[in-house]
């Protein structure tokens, strides 16, 4: 009996272990070859298994990946959810169990429709199905496209392909490489190892090619204020003005910067509650030929709440006035943090489902760029930076920089903020635009148009990051075409993988 149980569980247990190791491919560890080896081993474990067995093996792999990869979510649940330990663990388990569904679905589809481990399955079907299930995870229930394998390649040779097809093209090449390794192992066709070698070599070969051209004559001095405000104290009425004045004092020391950036919701008040302060600092910025960008919470006349970005000082908007149409309003809201699905049912159950500021409304998917001191910035508030298509559609021909404001204080000393920064770097590389990332307690950083970090300040310190950023002219193929050519290839791959074995028969 025990032998039978062990026989049934050894592949799922091995898959869970391999899935758990995948987190090492991402920040802060960045052992990027693991992102290729992990799905390769998964494909080996799936070989010659029934669709039902494959589903559980793939599901176990996903349990391992997300148990380690999104462990940082537990920091927020336990620190701010107001629930007992058992409830925290249950919620975390539910999240991991849900996210693992997609790797289970991949494995089931892979073995149901392509039962033989042929070359077409390894190089065409498996990579295509992986991208489809990744896309589903990034779309269903507003989406959670975190830990896409392509992100792990930001400092690897494959990164050179990001301006061509985005992070999804990198994921495709990771899976093609994994499929080649798995095929080589199963069929002892060691020549197949040349496929990942060729892909890596091609990445090295094109890494020096610039899709965009820097404009050094428009180099801009920026100052990013990292306030390091305690999240537990931030919204207490007694802390409102100490927090606001902390940002104001640090700003006064940096009026020589062209653009000064405060993080997401830096001002712990509704905009309508602090008009005098905003008017005064708007005037001060104009007097110093500078501009200030800040995150702020807004309330419309019909009592809709928005997580917004406001630009003050030297802007095209004139003197400060409360005008909701001149703000950027966050579109992609964080589930449970900024909106609660099925809120009529969930809110009464536990404090976690009734957090402050968890009833926001959405802004439009595409909105005008933020303009400050003549520079145009495509904005993304916190979680939005992980949605590559939204960021892509908000970058225009006039865009100089990508701007992202965040508050990762919810996740403490976990790996979450480091993974978040890794994703933000990919947006800069994909779109050929320098990135400005201002946060409450880190990671506050700026990157060049290739996603390389130019300057950053330490986490968990009050600090000001000073840097000079050079905007770019031109565009990348990814910004022009998006991912539709890639998904055309995905559809073609599935058709070929289905047809080729039958042609031989």
Curated annotation (Swiss-Prot):
Taxonomic source organism: Vibrio parahaemolyticus serotype O3:K6 (strain RIMD 2210633)
Domain annotation CN hydrolase: ranges: 225-471
Keyword Transmembrane: yes
Keywords linked to the UniProt accession: Acyltransferase, Cell inner membrane, Cell membrane, Membrane, Transferase, Transmembrane, Transmembrane helix
Coiled coil segments of this chain: none
InterPro entries: Apolipo_AcylTrfase, C-N_Hydrolase, C-N_Hydrolase_sf, LNT_N
Transmembrane spans: 26-46, 66-86, 89-109, 129-149, 161-181, 186-206, 481-501
GO cellular component: plasma membrane
Main function: Catalyzes the phospholipid dependent N-acylation of the N-terminal cysteine of apolipoprotein, the last step in lipoprotein maturation.
Family: Belongs to the CN hydrolase family. Apolipoprotein N-acyltransferase subfamily.
GO biological process: lipoprotein biosynthetic process
Topology with respect to the bilayer: Multi-pass membrane protein
One Gene Ontology term of the molecular function aspect: N-acyltransferase activity
Principal EC category: transferase
NCBIfam families tied to this protein: lnt (TIGR00546)
Protein name: Apolipoprotein N-acyltransferase
Residues annotated as the enzyme's active site: 264, 330, 382
Localization annotation: Cell inner membrane
EC number: 2.3.1.269
Keyword check for Isomerase: no
Pathway assigned in UniProt: Protein modification; lipoprotein biosynthesis (N-acyl transfer)
